[in-house]
A protein has these predicted regions:
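Structural preference for beta-strand elements that scaffold enzyme active sites
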Residues: 9-21, 49-52, 93-97, 155-158, ...
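The substrate-binding groove and active-site-proximal loops of carbohydrate-active enzymes
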Residues: 23-30, 65-75, 118-136, 177-183
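Hydrophobic alpha-helical segments at protein termini of multi-pass membrane proteins
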Residues: 39-43, 47-49, 56-78, 185-189, ...
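Catalytic domains of carbohydrate-active enzymes, especially glycoside hydrolases
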Residues: 17, 28-61, 82-99
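Active-site beta-loop-alpha junctions enriched in small/polar residues
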Residues: 20-27, 56-58, 101-103, 161-163, ...
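Active-site-adjacent "subsite" loops/lids of carbohydrate-active enzymes
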Residues: 78-89, 96-142, 169-171
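Mature N-terminal, pre-catalytic/accessory segment of carbohydrate-active enzymes
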Residues: 1-32, 46
Length: 219
């Protein structure tokens, strides 16, 4: 006979058995809820205990079409002041994969235009100022997750969209990678990793985890 308490203690009950999906680039919805909330609910209804979505300065123009709030100037403020983002973070998901891009790294594009380099600042090199600003923003956001979801059992994986295309922002895979961009992206990734590690070192928490990951696709 299987003992349910033993299953829970061994973590089997929270293992991610379901092949999941992500709520990025959704094109339609059926309810009055925001795109982010509706798609998160449907992913949960599919049986998934993992939600993958994005958090970045384009929250009001890309993917979810959430209302712009000038008070939202960081990832932490996006997590606390934007109701739909807070709602999905509070949902009953065990695992979160989140593409995070710092507000401190963003150069707004002209209205109606999209430039994927606008959210990263390591093309052709990475300045110390942007590095320091990114560290603080990711450190603060990680601290927020650890404090807010302390004891929840949630696991957060903070990462990036397809990193290969950050190295080749012109989408030409036949060209050699710019060595300065490669070094810049390496510093960018290490900064994010260090910010998360330091926040975990400096905060008291239990039964909640935050990890850094790097996503690639040209493999």
């Amino acid at each position: 006979k299987i003992d349910q308490n033993e299953i829970n203690e061994n973590g089997v009950a929270t293992y991610n058995f379901a092949i999941g999906t992500q709520t990025v680039g959704s094109k339609y919805k059926f309810t009055d809820e925001s795109m982010l909330v509706e798609t998160a609910r449907e992913i949960k209804n599919m049986g998934s205990n993992l939600l993958k979505f994005s958090m970045h300065p384009r929250y009001c123009t890309e993917n979810y079409g959430l209302p712009k709030n000038v008070a939202i100037t960081s990832l932490t403020k996006l997590a606390t002041l934007e109701p739909s983002v807070k709602e999905v973070l509070d949902m009953d998901f065990k695992y979160y994969h989140i593409w995070i891009y710092g507000f401190s790294q963003y150069t707004p594009e002209p209205e109606g235009e999209k430039d994927d380099t606008a959210q990263i600042k390591f093309i052709n090199g990475y300045s110390k100022k942007y590095e320091d600003d990114l560290y603080k923003e990711v450190y603060d956001f990680t601290s927020h997750l650890l404090k807010t979801y302390n004891g929840s059992g949630k696991v957060f994986y903070l990462g990036n969209w397809e990193g290969d295309w950050h190295l080749r922002s012109d989408y030409d895979r036949t060209k050699p990678v710019n060595p300065k961009t490669l070094k810049g992206m390496t510093r960018w990734a290490k900064t994010r990793q260090k910010a998360i590690d330091d926040a975990k070192r400096d905060n008291n928490y239990k039964n909640v985890e935050v990890y850094h990951y790097i996503e690639v696709n040209l493999v």
